[in-house]
Amino acid sequence: MRLCLWLLFLVVVTARPLRAQGDRCADCHIANPQADPVPEHTYDWEASAHGRNVVGCEKCHDGDATTFESFLAHRGILTSRNPASPTHRTNLPQTCGKCHIGPFVEFQKSRHYQLLRESRGEGPTCSTCHGAVAARLLSPRSLEKRCDTCHGPDGVHPNSDFAPDGRILLQEVNAVRELLATAPRLIGRVKDPVRKKALEDAYEQAQVPLREAVHSAHAFVFDQMRERLKAAKERSEALLIELANP
């Protein structure tokens, strides 16, 4: 009987989902906050899109997420102050770009990226706008204030239009996202398979210029972003009109 229970335990453990197995870094840091110099770092990760989608600590920090042995888990990890660390400010775009390919490609075209490379980490990087681990999306007003840090009247590169333009464009991105957010539920109610497929295709086609607009935002080429947002809005509105007229 004991042997059967032990075998059952092994089956359950080895069959644990990847989410449970991939959280060992966070499990240990959350369980031992007194040993963590910045426990809020782990809490922010857990509540973030990264945490919800099981993008574990090792994806950015390296290390071994398969063990609870502290020495082995932290082997190879470098402090973010080390220029060789994947979380050093200069290296963050490449680290984030392993998953966020589109934004990384566009960011490399920007003056921000040039400044980051030229200044050896003193220029703006991913965490400047998105935070360290929370991967947050700033509100339009928060984005305007962040842009004003450098581009306001007292900033290192004053530009009276840059910050308000960024706020307005992010508001437009959010507006298009809200339009599209209603579509999947309505499409799901369509009974005719042919019409449903056509609507699903139209939904995907509306998403394309929206993604392109968000990507181009990372190059800070606002004219291109406006053009892509215009296309996304037109396609989204056409889709919703079609859904309203069965």
Indicate residue ranges for each PLM-predicted region.
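Positively charged n-region of N-terminal signal peptides that target proteins for export
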Residues: M1-C4
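Hydrophobic h-region of N-terminal signal peptides that target proteins for export
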Residues: W6-P17
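Short sequence/structural segments immediately N-terminal
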Residues: P17-P246
